[in-house]
């Protein structure tokens, strides 16, 4: 497990930047350049440093640029392989007082940084997210919610804007009160959700109620069919957040996801038992019924692809 530690960049010189943006990447060169361009095109007048972190891939050093207003640094993940380690690598190299995170297949809209820094200054929040739009195979669906995201909200529902690519966070809080991303989560699955739960437990999260991130989903993702990791990761989320016991709808949701992962592994009887446990918390939980359907023979990949094409996940 990655524990909260002292900010590794505390001993660096005073930063000349308002924001450090960590872009994690793996073998998506064209999309990576688009993600970098979107950050460089931010309307925020102050300087922003961009830190590209390659994970399990050869870095393209030609992307580095020392332009003072929007410089680009290129690193390789020197921590645990995977997205959590990649993001922590970039955060450790950052010098600005505020961190932002972006993946190579996501795009920030031009006024994202300006609006979020403005809201953080107004509210004193240590973490701020924005609404997002999900694009799948050319079709887009918008998602959004209330101006504040509380811990109880995230226990109850996996809010789509509760994701690292929509967030900026005070760097000191990231390393201390909240803590960095846990690198021991199997397959790096649910690392965003687990971190957002910790951030919201620390303090309410401010929400910009406008859409400033385009999440470009790929229907076939490397972890979506890795059911054992999915099962184990969600089990850790429940274990590390005992407060789920007091939120039946939220516990039913996560139990339903675990049931689906179990059934998708071919462990049909265990999947049905876990689905029953989910329904015991809330009979309305749709994931429990999907898990039961898979346990009875409906192909799990077909269910996942069908949901993904509509901008939804399990």
What feature does the model see in each segment?
Residues 17-20, 49, 194:
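Cell-envelope/extracellular polymer assembly enzymes that use nucleotide-activated donors
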Residues 37-47:
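Short, acidic, metal-binding catalytic loop of nucleotide-sugar glycosyltransferases
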Residues 38, 54-63, 79, 103:
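A conserved acidic beta->alpha catalytic loop
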Residues 69-71, 85-86, 115-179:
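Flexible acidic/His/Gly-enriched loops in nucleotide-sugar-dependent glycosyltransferase catalytic domains
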Residues 77-94:
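Glycine-rich, basic loop-to-helix element that forms the pyrophosphate-binding segment
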Residues 99:
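Short aromatic/hydrophobic "clamp" motif used to bind/position activated sugar donors
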Residues 149-228:
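Conserved nucleotide-sugar donor-binding catalytic segment
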Residues 211, 215-218, 223-250, 268-280:
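Catalytic core of nucleotide-sugar-dependent glycosyltransferases
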